[in-house]
Every structure is written in C-alpha cells, then in structure tokens.
C-alpha cells in the first residue's frame, strides 16, 4: 500500500490534499479499535509484532488533550479570562509534561503516559475545574440554561466528551446516579461530565 501511495503521490504532482484523501479512504486507516478473540493477541504494547488487524489505541499527546478539553467544554470561554490569561494557562499545562534531556543540544520533549502525577492533574487541575464549571460561557452553563429532558442532557454530555450517545445500559446507569443527587441535579451533571472527561475513552485515540 505504501508503494502504491508513493507512486500515486508522484503522479498527482505531490498533491498533499489528494494524498490525505487516499490515506483516509484506505481500509488500514479505517480499521476499528475493537478487537475480537481472533486478533486479541495482535498487541504491539505487549511486545508482539504488529499485524495491523485493528487500530491500536494510543494516548493523546499533551497538546491534543489540552485542545480536546477546550473543545469539549468551552473552558476557554467560561468566566472572563483574557486571551493572555488563556495563553498562560496553556503554557502552564504544557510545562507539566516537558522533560528536559541532559545533552549538548538541551533537547526537550513532551510526554503524557498516564503516570500518577498526570492522572492526579487530570482529576484536580485548574483546567478540569473550568471544564466542569457552570460559569457563563461554559458548556455546562449552556446545557443547564437550556430546556430539555434529562435524557437529552445526558446525550449532550456524552456527545461533547465522547462524540457518541450513551448506550442503553449507560443511560440507565447515569439516570440512577442522577436520582441519588435529589434536588442537587447540577452537581450530578458536573460529576458526570468530570467522569467522562477522565475516562479512557476520552483520553485515548480510537
């Protein structure tokens, strides 16, 4: 496939847009991350030679995770933060993952590999707090301010965080969880959104 793509790329006068169209149209690119009993053993993370029988899950890079949180929650629009304040927040976020290499070039690299400090940061950081806030402009503010049934609000939370609607079992579980909050439903929606943003399905690229 790579040889064919290379030939066609040259023949198309190095048209990058056309190359991207070809790549995303391939079966290899469109493979599901769901595995079966037959290809469960195909796991490079376990040291096996990749057979490309399904898409391999990988964690988002720090920049990707930051941008995904912003898009999912409108965290950059909550409150009255200025553009410079938002840039400073992004810089602080990225600084947590910068690893300096002790060599002549003073190289740096960013990592996000699920360490305990990183997991705690995802649970308690300023950005997560803003993502789950109900300040004016935030996603949750818009959701709570608009009319709609409980099931619709749960659907919207799933769509924002995971780009899919909840399964029937998930919907039932979330409704039962919300019922335990009584009249404090707002806290329930905040906790639900927090849980979705901290789920593996949100953090991993499928």
Identify the role of each PLM range:
Residues 167, 171-174:
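Phosphopantetheine carrier-protein modules
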Residues 192:
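Globin-like tetrapyrrole-binding proteins
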Residues 3, 10, 17, 28-167, ...:
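An acidic, gly/pro-interrupted, aromatic-rich
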Residues 24:
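Acidic, mature catalytic/reactive cores of soluble proteins
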Residues 1-6, 16, 20, 174:
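Extended, hydrophobic alpha-helical segments in both membrane/secreted and soluble proteins
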């Amino acid at each position: 496939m790579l040889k064919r793509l290379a030939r066609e790329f040259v023949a198309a006068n190095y048209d990058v847009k056309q190359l991207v169209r070809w790549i995303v149209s391939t079966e290899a690119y469109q493979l599901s991350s769901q595995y079966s009993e037959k290809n469960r053993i195909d796991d490079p993370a376990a040291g096996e030679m990749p057979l490309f029988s399904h898409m391999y899950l990988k964690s988002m890079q720090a920049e990707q995770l930051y941008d995904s949180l912003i898009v999912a929650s409108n965290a950059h629009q909550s409150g009255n933060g200025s553009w410079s304040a938002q840039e400073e927040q992004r810089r602080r976020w990225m600084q947590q993952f910068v690893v300096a290499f002790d060599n002549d070039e003073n190289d740096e690299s960013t990592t996000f590999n699920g360490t305990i400090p990183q997991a705690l940061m995802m649970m308690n950081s300023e950005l997560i707090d803003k993502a789950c806030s109900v300040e004016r402009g935030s996603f949750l503010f818009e959701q709570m301010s608009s009319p709609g049934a409980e099931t619709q609000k749960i659907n919207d939370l799933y769509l924002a965080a995971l780009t899919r609607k909840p399964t029937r079992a998930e919907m039932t579980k979330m409704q039962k969880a919300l019922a335990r909050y009584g009249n404090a439903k707002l806290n329930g929606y905040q906790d639900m959104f927090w849980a979705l943003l901290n789920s593996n399905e949100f953090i991993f690229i499928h």
